[in-house]
Amino acid sequence: MCIRDRFKTRQIGKPVRFVELAQEINNSMPAYVVSRIIERMNKLEKPMKNSKILIFGVAYKKDIRDTRESPALDIIENFNSKGVEISYYDPFVDSLIVDNKQVNKETSQENFEKYDMLLMHTPHSEFSSINFSKINVPIFDATGSEFIDDAERI
């Protein structure tokens, strides 16, 4: 649910239950994504502490640089608390600070295989040129993106 819709429902002055439910679901998704990745890592017998996860796209929406309200921030914060080493790959976001710490920006596709897990968070159009099938790292797709074939999905 976009910020504009929440703002408009507040202007009405009465609760709109459908909007409230959508917001509750949206708010719970970062924790859900983290829990699914933990399950996947457990199946692969990889401990979360000191694991390396690369997040593809940290912007709020596709093909923009705005990270305000992005669920990626909550995901990163959650992983940080578990001792996971987080990096991101995003052609639109030059730098990112979460928990008063600079998040490492991955700049080279040649480094993708050094990670334990890849998370597709914001499916920027530019990612369609990446051949994900040639990357020998498990992928969790939180977006249902059309350019990843072999990934665990929400």
Predicted regions span which residues?
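Structural/interface elements that position substrates and couple domains in central-metabolism enzymes
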Residues: 4-154
